């Protein structure tokens, strides 16, 4: 009861903003589910943007990985600045002093661009050719066929008129009704000669309904965080790429900026926030990276629509995530069978391919394997390393498999997974906690230990809760409380008291959503609900201040790195919902 009172008082100072979501502005591109095209206002030098400032259409396929064209409005021969973009119901406006330019997707591959002003002209400045065979071509009065090495775009000037082909710039002039242009993204095959169809009004209705479904599918949150929930829905809605190239199903990218890929633990975290009300979408996101699993059971580090990266892996959080998804709503038997097979193969890969000294504990070969790329616990010790977080995830994963096997009527297999989980738990406590209960990292190269690390990653075994001996739990809880991990904004990934702490140090200090989520889950499993609520609430307040950035300054709360990152939003939604 006391914790509830503290929480309600802590929320009292927060208010819900009525401002429109700033999608389409620097760092937060606008798109719709299934599309690879985005629209955003860019500022040169901001968020790594290198070309001219202005309003840009981009393609997030890694085959492009760059801007497609800049839209420059002009009135009376003078260029007009786009000052901001505003999301409406199913479309966005690029605001200028002479009236807006409007964008709506008739379908994922068809973007409509409209100005109702009879005075506004628009130049479509396509990027300079990368190769001599990258060029725009013109067909008659309306059609421009823009052939690039990576893709093809068809530009249909529906309302207004365009100049004849002049290099890489297409100039569209208004009629009495203004301008309307349809841009068709042609990824495979060739143009069939048919003009793209679909009205702007129909596009708005379709996308409005699509967004409302996304918003309704997300979990409830305290009223003070409702605007952040809405922004999370916009972020999710704009970052789901359709089946194309390597992608066999819709896949939520981490970002429509430069982190335009999916990683092999990010996807699992994202599935959690979707699982409360839309199990089908959650299942697609949970399963998507398993599409690329090797015959041996290895999952790649990351995947784009054009490439698979095998040089690293990511931590096996999938059993923990799937167990949590099952608690939200049980899956049909067919999906349980699939999950049992996939998670089982992934687990066996770790047990057979990453236990180099055959001592029952598995190893990371690289910081990226841990997901904490440059964590001091990893990079200061030099892999291969046995770390307590890795064993904790596998223990929970084997428990998940034991429970799945039991549900599926495979009693003998269930008992085997239970025994393997217990065996690893015993080894974890014996080897990777010292006599005082402190977590430590073991180096295979010299059989040495590091128990002095001030990286939060070594405290993540707290997710095992009361499976661990009391002294181990007590030590990690005390470390979190007393060793400089908790700041005004949440949990630092490296203690602020550490000599290795860096404000913008990636995993050497900044606050990350998934790390916060795992730690909070662990504190709850240990009965530390008040502390869990405190940390969760701080993180939720942080994203209302600084958005859904990749990570955050642990001391100042400022946004760092990629400014619109989906798993940050997912961590927020789960944390906020469980506060609710």
Language-model features: where?
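Terminal accessory carbohydrate-recognition/targeting modules of carbohydrate-active enzymes
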Residues: 7, 13-224, 561, 566
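Extended glycan-interaction surfaces of carbohydrate-active proteins
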Residues: 221-260, 285-308, 356-386, 426-511, ...
């Amino acid at each position: 009861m006391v914790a509830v009172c503290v929480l309600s008082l802590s929320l009292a100072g927060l208010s819900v903003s009525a401002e429109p979501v700033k999608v389409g502005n620097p760092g937060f591109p606008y798109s719709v589910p299934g599309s690879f095209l985005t629209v955003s206002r860019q500022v040169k030098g901001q968020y790594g943007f290198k070309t001219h400032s202005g309003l840009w259409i981009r393609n997030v396929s890694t085959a492009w990985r760059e801007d497609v064209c800049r839209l420059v409005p002009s009135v009376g021969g003078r260029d007009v600045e786009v000052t901001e973009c505003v999301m409406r119901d199913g479309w966005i406006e690029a605001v200028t002093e002479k009236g807006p330019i409007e964008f709506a997707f008739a379908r994922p591959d068809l973007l409509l661009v409209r100005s109702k002003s009879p005075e506004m002209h628009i130049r479509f400045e396509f990027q300079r050719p990368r190769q001599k065979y990258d060029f725009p071509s013109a067909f008659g009065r309306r059609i421009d066929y823009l052939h690039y090495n990576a893709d093809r775009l068809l530009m249909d000037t529906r309302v207004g008129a365009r100049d004849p082909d002049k290099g890489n710039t297409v100039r569209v002039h208004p009629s009495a009704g203004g301008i309307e242009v349809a841009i068709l993204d042609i990824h495979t095959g060739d143009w069939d000669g048919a003009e793209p169809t679909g009205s702007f009004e129909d596009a708005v209705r379709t996308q409005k309904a699509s967004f409302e479904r996304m918003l309704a599918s997300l979990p409830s949150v305290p009223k003070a965080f409702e605007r952040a929930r809405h922004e999370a829905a916009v972020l999710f809605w704009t970052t789901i790429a359709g089946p194309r190239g390597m992608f066999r199903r819709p896949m939520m990218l981490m970002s429509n900026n430069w982190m335009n890929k999916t990683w092999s633990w990010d996807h699992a975290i994202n599935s959690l926030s979707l699982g409360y009300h839309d199990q089908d979408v959650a299942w697609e996101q949970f399963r998507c990276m398993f599409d690329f699993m090797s015959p041996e059971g290895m999952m790649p580090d990351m995947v784009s629509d054009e490439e698979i990266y095998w040089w690293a892996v990511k931590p096996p959080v999938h059993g923990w995530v799937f167990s949590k998804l099952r608690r939200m709503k049980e899956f049909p038997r067919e999906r349980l069978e699939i999950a049992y097979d996939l998670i089982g193969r992934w687990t066996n890969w770790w047990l057979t391919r990453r236990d180099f000294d055959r001592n029952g504990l598995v190893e990371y070969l690289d910081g990226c394997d841990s997901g904490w790329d440059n964590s001091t616990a990893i990079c200061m010790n030099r892999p291969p390393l046995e770390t307590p977080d890795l064993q904790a995830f596998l223990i929970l994963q084997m428990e998940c498999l034991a429970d799945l096997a039991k549900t599926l009527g495979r009693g003998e297999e269930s008992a085997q997974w239970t025994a393997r989980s217990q065996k690893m738990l015993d080894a974890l406590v014996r080897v990777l906690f010292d006599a005082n209960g402190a977590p430590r990292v073991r180096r295979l190269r010299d059989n040495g230990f590091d128990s002095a690390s001030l990286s939060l990653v070594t405290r993540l075994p707290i997710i095992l809760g009361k499976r661990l001996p009391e002294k181990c739990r007590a030590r990690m809880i005390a470390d979190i409380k007393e060793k400089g991990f908790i700041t005004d904004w949440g949990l630092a990934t490296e203690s602020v008291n550490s000599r290795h702490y860096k404000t913008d140090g990636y995993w050497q200090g900044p606050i990350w959503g998934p790390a916060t989520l795992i730690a909070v889950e662990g504190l709850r499993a240990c009965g530390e609900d008040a502390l869990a609520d405190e940390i969760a609430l701080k993180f939720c307040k942080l994203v209302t201040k600084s958005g859904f950035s990749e990570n955050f300054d642990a001391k100042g709360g400022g946004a760092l790195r990629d400014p619109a990152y989906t798993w940050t939003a997912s961590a927020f939604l789960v944390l906020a919902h469980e506060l609710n």
